[in-house]
Each structure stands twice: as structure tokens, then as C-alpha cells.
A protein has these predicted regions:
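Predominantly extracellular beta-rich ligand-binding scaffolds that present long acidic/polar faces
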Residues: 127-128, 136-153, 169-171, 175-181
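Ligand-recognition surfaces built from glycine- and aromatic
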Residues: 158-181, 211-220, 224-227
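Extracellular glycan-interaction patches encoded by glycine-rich segments
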Residues: 148-170, 186-190
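Short hydrophobic/aromatic patches on beta-strands that form ligand-binding or substrate-lining surfaces
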Residues: 29, 48-58, 115-117, 154, ...
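Extracellular glycan-recognition modules
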Residues: 30-90, 122-126, 163, 176-184, ...
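Extracytoplasmic low-complexity segments
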Residues: 1-31, 45, 185-236
Length: 236
């Protein structure tokens, strides 16, 4: 599948260059993940946006899209809870959960979805989004983040050791500001985010082979594919 997008400017996200999307990452749901920990120092725990496209296959375990953490009491994550058939978007600081959790039908629905979350500690606002639409309600209470980040993993919850994503993940972006998520979603068409303000991590997965993915944000923090995480031609 080939997705080609020409230059456009929608909702404040300027897609300045021709945009092709040939590959995504494919996770087996057993032990595949991507280590993005070189980028952990770029993430601002006081304010930020996470954005990614993902497609979940049938799974029998909890399936994290990503987890960024110091320890169990200080972490940021998006995870699908299999037994409850729910999605959880969580910012946890000093043991205080700021989270949105609600039922979801994404498992094995055959479709890519856009997932995003924004946090603004000083502004007292935490929001979650699926396909450009706010998911559940805005949360306003935060704990105080403690400690330096230990790891940033895609498709893996290292704190449990047994939770892995099964399916595809693509077009992963991190910002150190709150972004217009409807523009990131762009009516279901991934945007070229290179050059966007606040971009501190951007992994497009266009290598197609090998065991690393380049950071297109300009920060130079490549990701490492672990345990046979593969490339796929199935893209959003």
C-alpha cells in the first residue's frame, strides 16, 4: 500500500513536502518492541503531546502503544486493557493517576486508528484522543513528577514485562507543547510533521529493513528494534 500526500496546511500543521508512507512497524505480541530510550531526555513531563497511528490484532494480553517511565509511580502511557476491552491513557506522577479510561472496540477491527494525548501540568489539563475526537473527559489534577526517566519503549510495558502490542504502529511523534490533535489526525491521513514547532521525536519507520529507525525530528535519537520487530507494508 502506498500513501502519497502533497503539500497542504490544515489546522496549523503545515505539510510542506511531498509525503510518502511505505512502511510501518509490525509487532508479534510476544516479545517485540522498540527501544526509544535515547529520546527520553527530550520529553517534557510538564507539557507535551504524543501522537501515533496503530492497528491492533486479536490479543490475549494487555497491549501498550508506548510507555515512558521512571518507575511505577512516575510514568506516561497509552495501553489497551484486554480483559476489560478498554483503552487507558495515563499520566502518573508521584503515585497520583491522571488518566482517561473507557471501553473501546479497536481490537481486531482491521483498521488503523490515530491515538494522541496531551498534558499541561501548569494549565491543569490532560486530554486523550482517538481519530481526532476527544476520548472521554478532560482531567485536571496532576501529581508532581519525581526522578529522571529510565526508559521509553514502543509496544512494550517494561514495568510488567509481559505486556506487548500485537499489530502495527506507525508515524510516532512527540512534542514539547500541546498540539492541535485534529490537525495531527488530518481526517485520517498522516501528515508530514518535519519542521513543526515543538517536535522533539519523530519516527516514520521508512527504513524497510534493518534494526534501527531514524529520528526525523532533528534530535538524532534513533530507535532500536528488539527481538525481531519487523517492517510491514500495511500503513495508515
Amino acid at each position: 500500500m502506498l500513501a502519497l500526500k502533497l503539500g497542504q496546511n490544515i489546522g496549523g500543521i503545515a505539510n510542506r513536502n511531498s509525503f510518502s508512507n511505505l512502511y510501518s512497524l509490525l509487532f508479534d505480541g510476544v516479545d517485540d518492541y522498540v527501544n526509544l530510550s535515547d529520546a527520553r531526555g527530550e520529553i517534557d513531563v510538564q507539557i507535551g503531546t504524543f501522537s501515533a497511528w496503530a492497528k491492533l490484532e486479536t490479543t490475549s494480553i494487555n497491549a501498550p502503544i508506548f510507555k515512558f517511565y521512571v518507575n511505577a509511580n512516575n510514568q506516561i502511557t497509552i495501553i489497551y486493557l484486554h480483559a476489560a476491552n478498554e483503552l487507558k491513557f495515563m499520566y502518573k506522577a508521584a503515585g497520583t493517576n491522571t488518566q482517561v479510561q473507557a471501553s473501546s472496540s479497536i481490537e481486531n477491527d482491521g483498521s488503523y486508528h490515530h491515538f494522541a494525548m496531551t498534558w499541561n501540568v501548569d494549565g491543569g489539563e490532560f486530554k486523550a484522543y482517538i481519530d481526532g475526537v476527544q476520548f472521554d473527559t478532560t482531567q485536571t489534577t496532576f501529581g508532581s513528577w519525581s526522578g529522571s526517566p529510565t526508559a521509553f519503549h514502543l509496544g512494550h510495558n517494561a514495568l510488567s514485562g509481559t505486556d506487548f502490542w500485537k499489530g502495527n504502529i506507525d508515524e510516532i511523534a512527540i512534542f514539547d507543547s500541546v498540539k492541535d490533535v485534529s490537525a495531527l489526525y488530518n481526517n485520517g491521513i498522516p501528515n508530514n510533521l518535519v519542521g513543526e514547532s515543538g517536535l522533539v521525536g519523530y519516527w516514520r519507520n521508512e527504513e524497510g529493513t534493518g534494526t534501527t529507525i531514524a529520528d526525523q525530528s532533528g534530535q538524532g535519537n534513533s530507535g532500536t528494534l528488539i527481538n525481531g520487530t519487523n517492517f510491514s507494508r500495511v500503513v495508515p
